[in-house]
A protein has these predicted regions:
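Bacterial Sec-dependent N-terminal signal peptides
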Residues: 1-23
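Phosphate-group recognition and catalysis centered on beta-loop-alpha active-site segments
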Residues: 19-229
């Protein structure tokens, strides 16, 4: 009996370490200069087989071996960070209105809807629940969440997940540095740059001069066969 318990414990430790190693490996691939690996990122997680931005959708991605999930944050009336893309809960839940008009407990009474607009048994998850699920298993890309940067970072730090999360903003380096300078060096930050807008190159130059991000998210309305700069 003791031998069985010891084997079970060892297997649990090995599984835990391998999960942590997986998240670290994904991060290293992302940051390694010249790495030709292709990373798979799931937009709002596995929204085809589960409600978007739900725990089940993220769990599916982990089981499929996806490298990174992209999520969006909103804040409840009582200050909890939750996963929600839209400004209202109308499209993705059985409720109506803005998430900031409800407490977390009130939002839990609604059910998430799937991609075909049908009610499911799933509820809106908190950001902390998501990071606890993702810890050591998958990278997390917080797309809409800059408004809650400090609160999100506090949750990441609390759960030991600062190294596997990407935060983003469509703002110049000077502003991001002024607002969150101490945090920028402790996590991965990805600038979002709208190439069609005036001053886009200046924004990129500002980041390159001071922090050299591992990547940029570039937004554009049209492309050309080659760069015409």
């Amino acid at each position: 009996m003791k031998r069985f318990l010891l084997v079970t414990l060892l297997l649990s430790v090995v599984w835990s370490l391998s999960a942590q190693d997986k998240a670290l490996a994904i991060r290293n691939n992302l940051l390694q200069e010249g790495n030709n690996s292709v990373l798979v990122v799931s937009h709002r997680a596995d929204w085809r087989n589960a409600p978007e931005n739900s725990l089940q959708a993220i769990r599916n991605c982990i089981e499929m071996g996806v490298d990174m999930v992209e999520i969006d944050l909103k804040k409840t009336k009582d200050g909890h960070l939750i996963l929600m893309h839209d400004k209202t809960i109308d499209r993705t839940t059985t409720g109506k209105g803005k998430p900031e008009d409800y407490t977390l407990e009130e939002l839990r009474k609604f059910r998430l809807k799937n991609g075909t607009n049908h009610r499911t048994a799933h509820t809106i998850p908190t950001f902390e629940e998501v990071m606890q699920l993702c810890k050591g298993k998958i990278m997390v890309n917080v797309d809409k969440g800059y408004d809650y940067f400090n609160e999100a970072y506090a949750i990441l730090e609390k759960n030991g997940t600062t190294r596997q999360c990407i935060m983003k903003a469509s703002l110049p380096y000077e502003r991001v540095k002024a607002e969150h300078g101490d945090i920028l060096q402790k996590m991965i930050f990805m600038p979002v740059v709208a190439l069609d807008k005036e001053g886009a190159e200046d924004i990129i130059d500002g980041y390159m001069a001071h922090m050299k991000p591992m990547a940029y998210e570039l937004v554009f309305s049209k492309d050309t066969p080659r760069y015409n700069g």
